[in-house]
Amino acid sequence: TLPVIFETEAMTSLFSAFTGLWNGELLYKGISCLKDKWNEKILSEKITIEDDPRNVEALTIANFDDEGCPTRKKVLVKDGVFVQALHSTKSASCMQTESTGNGFKSGYASTIGVSPMNCCIVPGEKSLQQLEETMKDGLVITDLQGLHAGIDFVTTNFSLQASGYLVKDGKRDRSVTLITVAGNFMDLMKKVEEVGSDLDWSYH
């Protein structure tokens, strides 16, 4: 198997499909696979995940959620360890904790649920070019399709159509299209060796 780099837009698409793993309501109901993983190492130590509705660099910011609770920056995963979930007042009450300011409506007429806002993997220090040079030979995935049909949230399995390009001797070689990328999101994130530096909020 080839080493793989997920370019920012592709990883954002895949990551966004699984942000519900840290949803307090889904944890309480036992739907999230992290329900018994508190304070355990669940991902690579290279990965820290934050949720920050007040991030001024993001496209959307909120000082309060739709329940009137103040928002704040939360660290959900620290160096690969699951440390915190997202909560509305309802999910917080069920789990005997406090709201994290993540009680939002998905639409005007919808009910309030737990939702992330500006949730991201904290960027590393290497650029995409540096990652390609380090990898030497491998595949860079730039786009993923079929996220609605190819994702199993409960098992975190995925099978998606992808496109990108091959890297040979640390340099871009040729484009590839209509390939299938399949695996398990949690297993994938456990094997991450580096996180790129090019976080782009326009994709969120």
Residue positions per predicted region:
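N-terminal small-residue-enriched
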Residues: 1-204
